UniProtKB/Swiss-Prot annotation:
Main location: secreted
Subcellular location as annotated: Secreted
Keyword presence, Glycoprotein: yes
Gene Ontology biological-process entries: proteolysis
Protein name: Pregnancy-associated glycoprotein 57
Organism: Ovis aries (Sheep)
Similarity comment: family membership: Belongs to the peptidase A1 family.
UniProt superkingdom: Eukaryota
PTM text: Glycosylated.
EC numbers on record: 3.4.23.-
Length: 20
């Protein structure tokens, strides 16, 4: 479960970094 949540958190984080 922890691995799934990480991922989910990294997905939006990477999207925001790409926008910046």
């Amino acid at each position: 479960i922890s691995s799934r949540v990480s991922x989910l958190t990294i997905h939006p984080l990477r999207n925001i970094m790409d926008m910046l």
